[in-house]
Amino acid sequence: MTKHIFVTGGVVSSLGKGITAASLGRLLKSRGYRVTMQKADPYLNVDPGTMSPFQHGEVFVTEDGYESDLDLGHYERFIDENLTRDSNFTTGAIYQDLIARERHGDFLGGTVQVIPHVTNAIKAKFRGVEEQTDADVVITELGGTIGDIEGQPFVEAIRQYKKDAGAENVCYIHVSLVPYIAAAHEVKTKPTQHSVKELRSFGIQPDIIVLRSDHHIEDDVRAKIASFTDVDVDCVFTCEDAPSIYDVPRMMAEQDFDLRVCERLGLDPRERDMADWEGFLAAKDHAENEGDPVKIALVGKYTQLPDAYLSVIEALHHAGTHLGKHVEVELVDGEALSDDNVEQVLGDASGILVPGGFGKRAFDGKITAARYAREHQVPYLGICLGMQVAVCEFARDVLGYADASSSEFDPQCAHAVIDLLDEQEGVTEKGGTMRLGAYPCALVAGTLAAEAYGEALVQERHRHRYEFNSAYREELETAGLVVSGTSPDGELVEMVELRRDLHPWFVATQAHPEFKSRPTRPHPLFREFVRAAAE
């Protein structure tokens, strides 16, 4: 029987529920269990795909093309499994489906209500991911905070699920803040007491509590919380701020967090094998403390919020760890970058990366960054829009097409070297309609891309509407812009790079390789980019 673990949060949001859940997933997998993960988001958006990165951070894309919450990126990186669209759902998606079914007549004229219809639909999502993956353990994180009005149907659903699946197959973990009051020189337990009281008012008694704090929590504080919440003291854990999110599994393992979960669910506490994770942590510590610094300038549009580029930043650090280099990522506001200040801003960068994005704002600054990288022989990695930027800059400054651009930004430009995909013609809906998910890419032998991957055919995830305009392909290639990867039929250009006699390492891809990088297995493009930047 599949075991279900539900992770809720209390007091405030952004506590680290996702990291706690992902760490548990890693620990259970290290004990030999098949683990999958899921995020339930109570907001009314159907998915995060159209949400502003300033509000929600990056949109993570799964292999099967779902635009998901960034926590799925944490899940994939920690448990090293590819998740699917079944691993993330929202209130908006639940209601959209229910209303469509009601309009279709599926409820035979019955009154459609939150209980049982909404809660049943939510529980069907729990069962669905279990059936799809055949996992031993499903870990579901409930977004938001206990007490939020929009989250109440989800809380009711996880309460009911204990009866549906059997009490022995369900575990409730509550992550709560224990704030430190500087004036009093002590941590306060009252917020957690009230949070658990709120949770219990919905009929859920937590089995395990995880206390989040930026200060050390003494055993007497744990005992106090255990007493007030009716939770065994050995099931009250502390998760203090760590040097890195990747240190959290080790911190929790030292407290036997996963052992208590196994005991609660009747799972055989198999021996834990964390050798690969410990090896990664040792390499990371060595790279950060003793490795040569490698400064990467990430030129973007949403640089005020690093989470907007979370997977890119993590992929750079994975590569640095693998190579024994201390990667320093500097976020550069593309909107503020110009010919007048580019030397001052990018002059000390070992490498320049232009990530994905949408809209014209900051486009000119990204063009400036690509030009600087090309002219000054600075290693360059372009991702999605970053590839389009590289193509536009080359067409402008090498071919001499001063107005070369993307039809996304200038529909009337004479030289649209980046144009709308044929399949996007006539598409008016914004949500979930782009070219999404994994597509094959055939690499050209002898190119930097082919050497990085070491394979002739690779799969990468995509999220875009616009593509390289092949009408300019011959002209661009003649001038030195090599097409190094295409769709298997050769129709779509997926990767480009500068000829080696023009630049030592200048590679750009229409895909989002950052989504497939793992702590113990860095993505080859990021690995070779950092290697080139370190030389």
Over which residues does each language-model region extend?
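Short acidic-aromatic active-site loops that bind/stabilize oxyanions
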Residues: 108-119, 302, 356-363, 434, ...
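Cysteine-nucleophile active-site neighborhood
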Residues: 18, 22-26, 30, 345-440, ...
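Flexible phosphate-sensing "switch/lid" loops adjacent to ATP/NTP-binding sites
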Residues: 1-328, 335-351, 358-359, 366-372, ...
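C-terminal and late-domain segments of enzyme folds
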Residues: 436-440, 444-535
